[in-house]
């Protein structure tokens, strides 16, 4: 991977929002100490969803060292992230999601009270379909046929959609019962309401010595909501593509092979990415000629020049380029051999 800092992540989010401006971008963070600071950085990078993943979940293909020693409970990571986002006036801009051991309706309600609008249920759903958790998902030897391509083993699979539907029906019913007992009409009413939680004595000095009060701290959202009431796509600044696309579209409508030239600066990031989005929206999966649209640029290109670009778009640069040139790109990119990349 090439994500080593919040800045790298922000660039990836920017690129993804250029190739599909209608998609919500989510970032998964492993619950750990200090996750609040990271979550704030992710929110400032314009992510739409932040997933706080606890240490109890994970695929069977996960290394045993990761299963045993990586991460902390989702409750600790979620509350810290929720508190820091709220204190920095960022909480209402992003949707918080959590997973990693969510099994019951009670877990769902507690997650909501600790700040999550959404929860993920994966391992429990697999168990409902017949998974026995032998943790060899990557070996193609799943004995119950849940995770294998072996035809003989797949014959042993007994899972049906109804089993998963029943699981989530019972989870939803338990959520409804708990909310009814507490006097609330919807799950939204309890999001961020840590004041509804308290630590229960276990009757053992070793267990009661654990102080859970930091989990119950309720940060003041000020004038903002305690959660993201109306999930929306966080917008990022426009690129050079948006400025030049109207002219290109006019030429496309004339049904001609197009070749044009533009000046480019190092602040022009992800050039060619939004144009690829427009081309795909216009032509779909219809294959374009390799040199259908040829764009010539002169200057210093910013990061992600030609990222996620599609076949049929040709980008020629006279100058130099920054990081992430041609990331996951199917376009024809040309740069002079004397240019530093």
Over which residues does each language-model region extend?
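Alpha/beta enzyme core
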Residues: 1-97, 106-118, 320-324, 330
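A glycine-rich phosphate-binding loop feature that marks nucleotide/adenosyl-phosphate handling sites
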Residues: 29-37, 95-106, 128-129, 184-200, ...
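Phosphate/diphosphate-binding loops
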Residues: 73, 83, 91-96, 103-128, ...
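Terminal amphipathic helices with adjacent charged low-complexity linkers/tails
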Residues: 188-235
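Short, T/G/N/S-enriched strand-turn elements that build extracellular solenoid repeat scaffolds
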Residues: 275, 283-286, 302-309, 323-328
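Feature marks extracellular polysaccharide-active and adherence modules
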Residues: 278, 298, 308, 316-320
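The right-handed parallel beta-helix/beta-solenoid scaffold, focusing on the short coil/turn
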Residues: 291-293, 311-313
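Conserved small/polar residues in nucleotide/adenosyl-binding loops
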Residues: 331-337
